[in-house]
Amino acid sequence: MRTGVYPGTFDPITLGHMDIIRRGAKLVDKLVIGVTTNASKSPMFTVEERLAMVRRETADLPGVEVVAFDSLLMDFAESMGAAIIVRGLRAVADFEYEYQMAGMNQQLNNRVETVFLMADVALQPIASRLVKEIALYGGAIDRFVPKRVVQEVVARVEKIGKKGS
């Protein structure tokens, strides 16, 4: 069985993430979505909330599993028996960062390959960071995230308070 890992913060999961998940799942028998804590980011949602969100949005996709991890990506990939890591690319800036990460990951474990998938052109501008910023200023995010996620983001923004109001 060929296993792949698609790691991310998914805070929140976007339509861009969903596109990469659907396409990445076609490349392997099992795609493990690794929801991570990222010390360099300030998440809007807890790991548990993000896990629930991603599990719900991927429930209808065969061969997709969603788990949390808090370790080096290559250690996580090895623990999942993964042969590949799936990464989405939106722009040249993504490539530069991901290329460097893939090189470091190869140094850590050369048995796992990194596979880059280009984002769908219509989804390239979408980033979780921008979705949160738009929502915090009261903008509509329904074109960027799954419908149920819109409700969760709006509810969280109402709880923490909008900016500029």
Curated annotation (Swiss-Prot):
Keywords: ATP-binding, Coenzyme A biosynthesis, Cytoplasm, Magnesium, Nucleotide-binding, Nucleotidyltransferase, Transferase
Name of the protein in its database record: Phosphopantetheine adenylyltransferase
Source organism, top-level taxon: Bacteria
Pfam families: CTP_transf_like
Molecular function as annotated in GO: ATP binding; pantetheine-phosphate adenylyltransferase activity
Catalytic activity: (R)-4'-phosphopantetheine + ATP + H(+) = 3'-dephospho-CoA + diphosphate
Lineage of origin: Bacteria, Pseudomonadati, Pseudomonadota, Alphaproteobacteria, Sphingomonadales
Protein task: Reversibly transfers an adenylyl group from ATP to 4'-phosphopantetheine, yielding dephospho-CoA (dPCoA) and pyrophosphate.
InterPro entries assigned to the protein according to its UniProt record, in alphabetical order: Cyt_trans-like, PPAT, Rossmann-like_a/b/a_fold
